[in-house]
Swiss-Prot record:
Organism in which the protein naturally occurs: Shewanella baltica (strain OS195)
Taxonomic lineage from the root: Bacteria, Pseudomonadati, Pseudomonadota, Gammaproteobacteria, Alteromonadales
Residue numbers binding NADP(+): G127, A128, G129, G130, A131, N151, R152, T153, H154, T155, K156, M220, G244
GO-annotated molecular function: NADP binding; shikimate 3-dehydrogenase (NADP+) activity
Chain positions recorded as shikimate binding sites: S15, K16, S17, T62, N87, D103, Y222
InterPro entries: Aminoacid_DH-like_N_sf, NAD(P)-bd_dom_sf, SDH_C, Shikimate_DH, Shikimate_DH-bd_N, Shikimate_DH_fam, Shikm_DH/Glu-tRNA_Rdtase
Annotated protein name in UniProt: Shikimate dehydrogenase (NADP(+))
Gene symbol of the encoding locus: aroE
Summary of subunit composition and partner proteins: Homodimer.
Length: 282
């Protein structure tokens, strides 16, 4: 029997998820289909219910439904709880829905694939939206030395710090801080841009001196050409600049493993996806 999976979003026609999961399924001999479903902005719950009633086993969720999906879950993972959003839904044997957030796990997996280890790294996270919030716990669990969060609106960055310093009886309190962009100083091993500024060819207002020849920069956005943030980082002398395509594949792999109990080969699929992206009409 072929199991059915999908990704829900609005818009959704641009989604790479059907291609990614199709590539995961073939070599692992998993019998499944995976489709993109456009849900009405005011009709996500009805669309999801219809999907599960028709035999759907699990689903990914993207903009703008991640918070709505969170509210529909009967149980959630620690990552999803702290992110306040889910991107992966699983219909369990008892008919309940479990929610996970694999975005941050995908980010960490891609960083480790590129850098080897995140242990004792000093990390600067730019942005304080949902993308940033979803990756904080996985970064901390990767045993980084320090996480600095900086955002155009400082109060939003401080709010994230307050949330995560209260986790596990303050276990992370000494590791997470919020700093105004204009007051950023010192050196960072890794700088992660979680904002969508690159999609518009724009940059967060960052001081150039935070980039050194040892700094690795990571933009969660991606495209056929180098993103605006990564162009800027390289022009300032960064050691390396990585885009978010590997994060996309990584989070999909974590979802696939949750559903199927099989770990797919992400690097092969990442290469195929990169080639596909480069071949698309500009």
């Amino acid at each position: 029997m072929t199991d059915r999976y999908a990704v829900f979003g609005n818009p959704i026609s641009h989604s790479k998820s059907p291609f990614i999961h199709g590539q995961f399924a073939a070599p692992t001999q998993e019998s499944l289909t995976y489709e993109a479903i456009l849900a009405p902005v005011d009709g996500f719950e009805a669309s999801l219910t219809a999907f599960f009633n028709a035999g759907g086993k699990g689903a990914n969720v993207t903009v703008p439904f991640k918070e709505q999906a969170f509210a529909l879950c009967d149980s959630i993972s620690p990552e999803a709880k702290l992110a306040g959003a889910v991107n992966t839904l699983s219909l369990l044997a008892d008919g309940t829905i479990r929610g996970d957030n694999t975005d941050g796990l995908g980010l960490v997996a891609d960083l480790i694939a590129n850098l080897g280890s995140l242990q004792d790294q000093r990390v600067l996270l730019i942005g304080a939206g949902g993308a940033a919030r979803g990756c904080i716990l996985p970064l901390l669990n990767a045993e980084i030395a320090q996480l600095t969060i900086s955002n155009r609106t400082h109060t939003k960055a401080q709010l994230l710090v307050d949330i995560f310093t209260s986790v596990d009886n303050g276990a992370y309190a000494s590791k997470v801080t919020a700093v105004e962009m204009s007051e950023l100083a010192g050196e960072f091993d890794i700088i992660i841009n979680s904002t969508s500024a690159s999609l518009a060819g724009e940059l967060p207002p960052l001081p150039a001196h935070i980039i050194t020849t040892q700094t690795v920069c990571y933009d969660m956005m991606y495209g056929a050409s180098v993103t605006a943030f990564n162009q800027w980082a390289l022009s300032q002398g960064a050691a390396k600049a990585i885009d978010g395509l590997g994060m996309l594949v990584g989070q999909a792999a974590k979802s696939f493993t949750l559903w199927r109990g099989v770990e797919p080969d992400t690097q092969v699929v990442l290469t195929l996806l990169r080639d596909k992206l480069m071949a698309e009409p500009k």
